[in-house]
Amino acid sequence: MKLSSGKKLAAASAIAMLACSVLASFVSAQEVSPVEDSPTRSYVLVDQFEHTTTRYTGGNENEDALRFNTSGWIGGDYNRLWIYTEGTKPYKGKLEDADVQVLYGRLVVPFWDLQAGIRYFKPLSSGPSRNYAVVGVQGLAPYRFGVQAAAFVSERGDVSARAELEYELLLTQRWILQPRFAINIALKAVREQGIGRGLNDVEFGLRLRYEIRREFAPYIGVSWQKRYGGTAQFARARGEDTGGGSLVAGVRLWF
């Protein structure tokens, strides 16, 4: 019997979450103290809410846009429901590059969560949106590098992955410099979305913020993005640039 795309995605998501739960239970039984989970709490971080002015390498017009990147969770120390959102809204145009993830996270070792769930993604190009099953990890590496990495399987069986690395350098008690690096790869091309096989794109950002309060910090910075391989070829075929640098200014807040 042939399954529909929606049923395939639901099945893949269920398998991913089951695998996450089983592995998390096994690892936590070995590494984490079997104390009852803490009371339910919540946390929301608006890591980026910014105006961007992008200058493209191909000489196209500068583009002004609003960009956001948020994350939040509800739960205890060991079990959490995570929600991630990210997107770009040009001032002259519709919302694009929209990304929403809803994940179950389980603490498996100190500072590291194993996560699984579902994702909705609308690419920067004019291609169709897709739904994905997600399995990933999120936590703090040695020297307090923040790491988030995930693998995605779409409703059509397309496999891709994304990794992000960031660090917070305290210049003073209030001035903080935050470099951030992100990379996307795909196991096969998805022409409708303008995604090529292999390395798709990389992004590097550097933001300097001033914490008026810990919960509220305006910032300025720069960001650079470059597409590669088949993804760059698809972009050129649409008349788009393959890279560019941006000046950014925004606010970071949490509650």
Listing of model-derived features with the role each one plays in the protein:
Residues 128-191:
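Detector for outer-membrane/organellar transmembrane beta-barrel domains
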Residues 206-211, 241-255:
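Outer-membrane beta-barrel "beta-signal"
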Residues 48-50, 83-87, 116-120, 149-153, ...:
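Transmembrane beta-barrel strands of outer-membrane/channel proteins
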Residues 77-83, 110-115, 143-149, 172-177, ...:
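Repeated loop/turn-to-beta-strand initiation elements of outer-membrane beta-barrel proteins
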Residues 74-76, 106, 139, 151-153, ...:
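Residue-level signature of outer-membrane beta-barrel architecture
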Residues 40, 62-68, 96-100, 129-133, ...:
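Residues that define the transmembrane beta-barrel architecture of outer-membrane proteins
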Residues 1-33:
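Cleavable N-terminal export/targeting peptides
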Residues 2, 26-91:
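Outer-membrane beta-barrel initiation region
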